[in-house]
């Protein structure tokens, strides 16, 4: 184990612990979301999912900027992040899809088991990302998939097909973008991700009323990421920096 940065001050140590606490707070949001699911409150559950996504999106850049790994080498932020992500990105969305009938009764157990199984294998990969910071395989972001299914009221057969495809892609070498870390089109990807989350939140607050503009965003955002996934995978070589 590497030693702590000898130049780190008490303030640096406190900041590092605070950032780890921010990451760990995702389990509290996940627990709140699970309670909402069990109580039959889909809107509340989605709000918890979105809050967890926001935390997951900001803790990494903050940790890297604060050099947390150097300050607290005895705490592995990557492992902490993976543990939290499996709860908020996989287990909570699976519970959501099971409780709120995203799939037909005969398919629910099979597909939920497939999601849990393929996702845990993905999290165990030793090389999760390419040299230019694209994910290898579908990165188990079911926290985006499940609310999108629900808010779009997509037909159950569509949900089945998409879920099977994503489970298969989880264990492949298909390249999926990390909006924050991939330099190529970073601004566009962050904007699209932000619009997706905003549309998801507003449509959730409006539910059960549907908004056509918001529904369009909920379709267009994943369509954009599907396009750049195909583009990057077909190219093979690392994407240009800009």
Regions found by a protein language model. Give the residues of each.
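Hydrophobic, membrane-facing alpha-helical anchors
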Residues: 1-6, 59-64, 104-123, 160-175
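C-terminal membrane-associated helical module and adjoining short loops/tails
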Residues: 1-6, 135-242
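Active-site-proximal cofactor/substrate-binding loop regions of enzyme domains
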Residues: 7-68
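Short, amphipathic, aromatic/basic-enriched membrane-interface segments that mark the entry/exit
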Residues: 11-21, 75-83, 128-136, 179-187
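Multi-pass membrane catalytic core of lipid/isoprenoid biosynthesis enzymes
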Residues: 19-24, 65-122
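Hydrophobic alpha-helical transmembrane segments
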Residues: 23-36, 55-60, 84-89, 133-141, ...
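Helix-coil boundary and interhelical linker segments in multi-pass alpha-helical membrane proteins
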Residues: 32-48, 83, 87, 91-112, ...
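Membrane-anchoring/interfacial helices and their immediately flanking loops
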Residues: 118-141
């Amino acid at each position: 184990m590497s030693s702590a940065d000898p130049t780190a001050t008490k303030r640096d140590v406190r900041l590092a612990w605070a950032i780890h606490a921010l990451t760990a707070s995702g389990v509290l949001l996940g627990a709140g979301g699970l309670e909402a699911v069990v109580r039959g409150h889909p809107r509340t559950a989605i709000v918890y999912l979105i809050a967890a996504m926001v935390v997951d999106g900001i803790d990494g850049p903050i940790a890297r900027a604060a050099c947390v790994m150097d300050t607290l080498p005895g705490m592995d932020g990557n492992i902490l992040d993976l543990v939290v992500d499996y709860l908020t990105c996989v287990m909570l969305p699976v519970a959501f899809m099971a409780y709120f009938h995203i799939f037909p009764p005969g398919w629910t157990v099979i597909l939920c088991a497939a999601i849990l199984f393929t996702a845990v294998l993905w999290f165990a990969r030793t090389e999760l990302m390419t040299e230019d910071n694209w994910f290898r395989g579908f990165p188990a972001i079911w926290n985006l998939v499940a609310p999108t299914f629900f808010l779009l009221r997509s037909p159950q057969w569509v949900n089945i097909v998409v879920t099977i495809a994503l489970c298969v892609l989880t264990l492949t070498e298909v390249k999926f973008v990390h909006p924050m870390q991939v330099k190529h089109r970073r601004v566009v990807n962050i904007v699209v991700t932000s619009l997706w989350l905003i549309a998801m939140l507003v449509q959730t607050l409006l539910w059960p009323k549907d908004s056509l503009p918001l529904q369009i965003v909920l379709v267009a955002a994943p369509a954009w990421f599907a396009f750049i996934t195909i583009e990057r995978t077909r190219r093979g070589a690392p994407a240009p920096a800009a």
